[in-house]
């Protein structure tokens, strides 16, 4: 979805509520309960309640309203956002060394997202199903099985797309936020004293009174802003203004009212700490609220799943992950995709997490490290963009960065206390993804360098072939070429073994640009190199999927007629062996071999008919 289409502002804003704010919107299910559950050494005390509420409120204001919605969302690449987009923008006007550091930061941030995405569906759905403990305590043993059943159904429908179901997301989430507001307001009216916590003095008093324990407790407070990255990542779907409008008119007021309503309830009934969210509701509303909470958490999980599909496609297109099958589930919306391998790997990981942790309170200990780590990296990358791309005053940018880090670093440091009790999980998953992405990128570069370091000059070889041509056969041959100035391996091997050349030879290069989309006018560049050789460079954005048939269509419009079923596609298939290296580089090389063996083959990747493909093998030592 984009603001470019002719939908009204209210419709786009409503849609943003349904997709963007699912994660942060379901945080009231567990945040205040975790803050005051007694794990930090204090119970439901007036000063503690006021302190936590004040911290939550001002985090929502500073981190979400000011940092992300006002500052970070200014950094867009043709309207698109996300940590990899920010990485790309930050590295545009910097030195090679600085760019390398920024790329590493961006990849770490993307890896953190993969670590977080395993936890979000599990903690969200489990916290909703745990409402059964209030409705029918004897059913508490069913929480884990029911959570797995709900998530199984969610992952199963991914292959069908979420277009039809997605139309229900917005009204359900709007209802959810309105119910949050009503439940909270009802409780605040009964105990308006809780509104004193709006004063930031209570946050300061909280630190002064509880000292070291208050710092560690920040690890629970951060649960209130999980999902904040989605605001920036989904910017390309809805636009900046609708996302901001949804936050300030619906989401922020509803969250604040509900958190303060829970606080008002706890001041009167401290025993409600076992589940303050559900105990806000009257008895007759518990079952409807349980159903609505389950729907809201499913929607929050769907938003995260869609986010990991989008991030994976972007990483594949930018060359940080191996090619994999990407299925478009909508003819109208390019952003609706399904990646089977990622879907079922994520499902398996989520089920393992649910079975292992058993309760959302246990999972809360694992939550936060990835979120706050990404926040630190976002602060550094976004201020780099402000300085290098927007040319803001360096002292002003430094003040902004210091202000952001004064919040981000304490939050991240407080979450490190969770490392042994569950925080190791997202960090481990993030480390695995970082290793995979850096291995694929670096080893792929090493492979291409080895293949082309002894490559012949393209111009010289074409001149030689035109002067002393081999036997010519009718038809058109397309050779996939990664480098513009080097003869493709497949062409060299075809001449070496078959000693023939087609009447027309097209050297096709598919290139990914540093933009989400490439206009059709710029899609194809054609250059005639000789009477029988042409070079075609097709450019795509990282949100687009290359399609050779579309390239041929554009070539036809520009005078180079190509018919798919009358063309032979020659591709090189590299058989790789790991050469002599230090042991740690040998391990990385073997990981690359494993990734390459399981990567999507080029004919499937570019939608080339299998019966038109000829693969010529070559052995390369890396």
Curated annotation (Swiss-Prot):
<keyword id="KW-0406">Ion transport</keyword>
<feature type="transmembrane region" description="Helical">
    <location>
        <begin position="247"/>
        <end position="267"/>
    </location>
</feature>
<dbReference type="GO" id="GO:0015293">
    <property type="term" value="F:symporter activity"/>
</dbReference>
<feature type="transmembrane region" description="Helical">
    <location>
        <begin position="419"/>
        <end position="439"/>
    </location>
</feature>
<dbReference type="Pfam" id="PF22776">
    <property type="entry name" value="K_trans_C"/>
</dbReference>
<keyword id="KW-0630">Potassium</keyword>
<dbReference type="InterPro" id="IPR053951">
    <property type="entry name" value="K_trans_N"/>
</dbReference>
<dbReference type="Pfam" id="PF02705">
    <property type="entry name" value="K_trans"/>
</dbReference>
<keyword id="KW-0472">Membrane</keyword>
<feature type="transmembrane region" description="Helical">
    <location>
        <begin position="276"/>
        <end position="296"/>
    </location>
</feature>
<feature type="transmembrane region" description="Helical">
    <location>
        <begin position="137"/>
        <end position="157"/>
    </location>
</feature>
<keyword id="KW-0813">Transport</keyword>
<feature type="transmembrane region" description="Helical">
    <location>
        <begin position="165"/>
        <end position="185"/>
    </location>
</feature>
<dbReference type="InterPro" id="IPR023051">
    <property type="entry name" value="Kup"/>
</dbReference>
<feature type="transmembrane region" description="Helical">
    <location>
        <begin position="363"/>
        <end position="383"/>
    </location>
</feature>
<feature type="transmembrane region" description="Helical">
    <location>
        <begin position="103"/>
        <end position="123"/>
    </location>
</feature>
<protein>
    <recommendedName>
        <fullName>Low affinity potassium transport system protein Kup</fullName>
    </recommendedName>
</protein>
<comment type="similarity">
    <text>Belongs to the HAK/KUP transporter (TC 2.A.72) family.</text>
</comment>
<feature type="transmembrane region" description="Helical">
    <location>
        <begin position="49"/>
        <end position="69"/>
    </location>
</feature>
<feature type="transmembrane region" description="Helical">
    <location>
        <begin position="9"/>
        <end position="29"/>
    </location>
</feature>
<dbReference type="InterPro" id="IPR053952">
    <property type="entry name" value="K_trans_C"/>
</dbReference>
<dbReference type="InterPro" id="IPR003855">
    <property type="entry name" value="K+_transporter"/>
</dbReference>
<dbReference type="GO" id="GO:0006813">
    <property type="term" value="P:potassium ion transport"/>
</dbReference>
<keyword id="KW-0812">Transmembrane</keyword>
<dbReference type="GO" id="GO:0016020">
    <property type="term" value="C:membrane"/>
</dbReference>
<feature type="transmembrane region" description="Helical">
    <location>
        <begin position="213"/>
        <end position="233"/>
    </location>
</feature>
<feature type="transmembrane region" description="Helical">
    <location>
        <begin position="337"/>
        <end position="357"/>
    </location>
</feature>
<comment type="function">
    <text>Responsible for the low-affinity transport of potassium into the cell. Likely operates as a K(+):H(+) symporter.</text>
</comment>
<feature type="transmembrane region" description="Helical">
    <location>
        <begin position="396"/>
        <end position="416"/>
    </location>
</feature>
<keyword id="KW-0769">Symport</keyword>
<keyword id="KW-0633">Potassium transport</keyword>
<keyword id="KW-0997">Cell inner membrane</keyword>
<keyword id="KW-1003">Cell membrane</keyword>
<dbReference type="GO" id="GO:0015079">
    <property type="term" value="F:potassium ion transmembrane transporter activity"/>
</dbReference>
<dbReference type="GO" id="GO:0005886">
    <property type="term" value="C:plasma membrane"/>
</dbReference>
<keyword id="KW-1133">Transmembrane helix</keyword>
């Amino acid at each position: 979805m984009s603001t470019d289409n002719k939908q009204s502002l209210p419709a786009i804003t409503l849609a943003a509520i349904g997709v963007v704010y699912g994660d942060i919107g379901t945080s009231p299910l567990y945040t205040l309960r975790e803050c005051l559950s007694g794990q930090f050494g204090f119970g439901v005390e007036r000063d503690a309640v006021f302190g936590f509420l004040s911290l939550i409120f001002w985090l929502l204001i500073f981190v979400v309203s000011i940092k992300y919605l006002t500052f970070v969302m200014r950094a867009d690449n043709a309207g698109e956002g996300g940590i990899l987009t920010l990485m790309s923008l930050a590295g545009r006007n910097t030195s090679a060394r600085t760019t390398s550091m920024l790329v590493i930061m961006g990849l770490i941030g993307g890896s953190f997202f993969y670590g977080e995405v395993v936890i979000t569906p599990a903690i969200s759905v489990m916290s909703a199903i745990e409402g059964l403990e209030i409705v029918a305590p004897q059913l508490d043993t069913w929480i884990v099985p029911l959570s797995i059943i709900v998530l199984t159904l969610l992952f199963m429908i991914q292959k069908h797309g979420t277009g039809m179901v997605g139309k229900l997301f917005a009204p359900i989430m709007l209802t959810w936020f309105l119910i949050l507001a009503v439940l909270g307001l009802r409780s605040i009216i009964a105990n308006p004293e809780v509104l004193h916590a709006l004063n930031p003095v209570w946050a300061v008093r909280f630190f002064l009174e509880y000292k070291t324990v208050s710092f560690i407790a920040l690890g629970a407070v951060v649960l209130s802003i999980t999902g904040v990255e989605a605001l920036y990542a989904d910017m390309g779907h809805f636009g900046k203004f609708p996302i901001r409008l949804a936050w300030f008119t619906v989401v922020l007021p509803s969250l604040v009212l509900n958190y303060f309503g829970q606080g008002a309830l706890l001041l009167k009934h401290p025993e409600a700490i076992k589940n303050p969210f559900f105990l806000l509701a009257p008895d007759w509303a518990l079952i409807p609220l349980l159903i609505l909470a389950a729907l809201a958490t499913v929607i929050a999980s769907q938003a995260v799943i869609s986010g990991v599909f989008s991030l994976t496609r972007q990483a594949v297109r930018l060359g940080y992950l191996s090619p994999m099958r990407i299925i478009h589930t909508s003819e109208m919306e390019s952003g609706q995709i399904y990646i089977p391998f990622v879907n079922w790997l994520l499902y398996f990981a989520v089920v393992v997490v649910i079975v292992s942790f058993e309760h959302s309170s246990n999972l809360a200990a694992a939550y936060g490290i990835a979120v706050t780590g990404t926040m630190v990296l976002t602060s550094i990358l976004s201020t780099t963009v402000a300085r290098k791309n927007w040319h803001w005053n360096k002292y002003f940018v430094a003040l902004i960065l210091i202000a952001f880090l004064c919040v981000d670093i304490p939050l991240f440091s407080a979450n490190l206390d969770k490392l042994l009790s569950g925080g190791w999980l997202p960090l481990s998953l993030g480390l695995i993804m970082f290793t995979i992405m850096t291995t694929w990128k670096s080893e792929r570069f090493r492979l291409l360098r080895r293949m082309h370091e002894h490559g012949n000059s393209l111009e010289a070889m074409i001149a030689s072939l035109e002067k002393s041509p081999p036997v010519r056969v009718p038809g058109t041959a397309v050779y996939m070429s990664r480098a513009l100035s080097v003869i493709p391996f497949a062409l060299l091997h075809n001449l070496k073994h078959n000693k023939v050349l087609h009447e027309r030879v097209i050297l096709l290069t598919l290139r990914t640009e540093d933009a989400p989309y490439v206009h059709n006018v710029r899609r194809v560049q054609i250059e005639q190199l000789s009477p029988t050789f042409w070079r075609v460079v097709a450019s795509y954005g990282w949100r687009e999927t290359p399609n050779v048939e579309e390239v041929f269509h554009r070539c036809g419009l520009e005078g180079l007629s190509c018919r798919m079923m009358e063309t032979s596609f020659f591709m090189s298939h590299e058989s790789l062996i790991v050469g002599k290296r230090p042991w740690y580089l040998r391990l990385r090389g073997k990981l690359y071999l494993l990734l390459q063996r399981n990567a999507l083959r080029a004919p499937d990747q570019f939608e080339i008919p299998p019966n038109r493909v000829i693969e010529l093998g070559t052995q390369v030592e890396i």
